Amino acid sequence: ISTVIFPEDIIAQGDLLITPRRVVFEGSKRSMDLNLANTGKDTATYAISLLQIRMKEDGGFETITEPDSGQRFADRFIRFFPRSVTLGPNEAQAVKIQLIKSNELEPGEYRSHFYFRSIPKISPLGEKEKAKDTTTISVMLTPVFGITIPAIIRVGESTARVTLSDLRFEMANDTTPRFTLV
């Protein structure tokens, strides 16, 4: 039996490993690097963009077309390069991210999401196509993987406070400890 342990700030999907798993600018922080690595066996190209998405009550995601009251987006204040990367097997590259126009930021939290989308391979022009059977119909599905990570800008002191009260520690079935909130 073997166990592989990855640090908790790493995300991988579709052979793309991203670290750290979120971009956060607060205080005097004005730049950072995202590290991308291709963990697959083939060369892969990824397009990088910023999206506005939110989580729905059922846990799914939706694109934001109308912002909620008081909702602020970070995309106007973030510059990043390159906008696309091509990585060979086991290759890595850094994406430089900078906070811009910071003098225009009002106190509060700004949020967007970096979207890393794989770009399917296309055959070069002039390459001979394989002979096709013209007596049948076929369909070819090409999966396009994508992953998002949050980009957050925090300006000023946080006003969020949490208080837990009426906590109880119980033993369920006399063997399993359990916290209960009233």
Named regions from a protein language model:
Residues 32-37, 90, 97-99, 112-116, ...:
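Buried hydrophobic-core signal for structured, non-transmembrane domains
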Residues 11-44, 84, 160-182:
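Beta-sheet-dominated interaction scaffolds and their linkers
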Residues 42-50, 59-60, 108-109, 162-163:
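Short, hydrophobic/aromatic beta-strand segments
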Residues 46-72:
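Short acidic, flexible loop segments centered on an aromatic residue
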Residues 66-103:
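Intrinsically disordered, low-complexity Pro/Gly/Ser/Thr-rich segments with frequent PxxP/GP/PP motifs
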Residues 26-27, 89, 106-107:
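Surface-exposed loops/turns
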